[in-house]
Amino acid sequence: MISVKVPASSANLGAGFDCMGVALKLYNIIEVEEIEKGLEITSSPDDPSIAKDENNLVFKAMKVVFNEVGWYPKGLRINLINEIPLTRGLGSSAACISGGIYAANLLCGGKLSEEEMIFLAAKMEGHPDNSTPAMIGGLVFAVLEENKVNYIKFVVPNRLKFAVFIPDFQLSTEYARNILPKYIEFKDAVFNVGRAALFASAITTGNYDLLPAATQDRLHQPYRKNLIPDFDKIVNLSLEFGAKGAFLSGAGPSIIALIDENYDSFEQNVKLALSSLELKSKWDLMILEADNSGATVFSVQSSSSFKR
């Protein structure tokens, strides 16, 4: 059996639409082994929305690798242990795709390079902002080209933490993408380009005082926040208690605030305030660090029939 741990991720980070993302210390575990025949899939918790057949996203990702290397197992047993909440904007699909590709490559004897796996994952998901940090960890600036992903990985210091607000409702990424306009004004593009560059500079230099300005956005948040009635209240609350910027995590509905000090008092004060505010939804708060490793293998007892 091969066991792989793959992190959650947050994409966009404000102004970096479809090109910036960070891996977070919240994990799914994928256990796979070759069996004599058939496909067996189990999951914990046993969520009925997770396909247990060939439509399962982890299996689909593994099949991409098998097609690429030209080898197929006789059968597969897949066990999924999921901590990453589904359709909350925390990269659950990217974890399935990147983790499935990573696990399948191990089953195939590591035939694919890291660069090849990064490309296959981004191509399958359609953009690299979640899949690349899920694969390699850290904070990633990435662009999907025709046959490769151009990216830069930045190792995030422990000083910068991520206050993740997770609501009690789901939001389809497809739906949240479909509400975006087909065209934007030139001035809004300029607004985002400048702030995305400022964000990269603030992160790499440690000048976190620039983050409140650098996390502003005009490409997606003004449209998507209407799907999240508490968005402005959560963002304003975070800034009030010292966050260095707050933004939608991916397409939402989760919201992330960046904090670089007074972590315990931030958590206590925000939780107390959440209990007293009139909100449309119930929100859970988790303080997470960045994961700088990405997908990792922590157990290999392979009985794969792959011939090296």
Swiss-Prot record:
One GO MF term attached to the UniProt entry: homoserine kinase activity
GO cellular component: cytoplasm
Keyword Transferase: yes
Cellular compartments annotated: Cytoplasm
Residue ranges of the TM segments: none
Substrates-to-products reaction catalysed: L-homoserine + ATP = O-phospho-L-homoserine + ADP + H(+)
PROSITE patterns for this protein: GHMP_KINASES_ATP
Keywords of the record: Amino-acid biosynthesis, ATP-binding, Cytoplasm, Kinase, Nucleotide-binding, Threonine biosynthesis, Transferase
Protein family: Belongs to the GHMP kinase family. Homoserine kinase subfamily.
Full protein name: Homoserine kinase
Species per Swiss-Prot/TrEMBL record: Caldicellulosiruptor saccharolyticus (strain ATCC 43494 / DSM 8903 / Tp8T 6331)
Taxonomy of the source species: Bacteria, Bacillati, Bacillota, Bacillota incertae sedis, Caldicellulosiruptorales
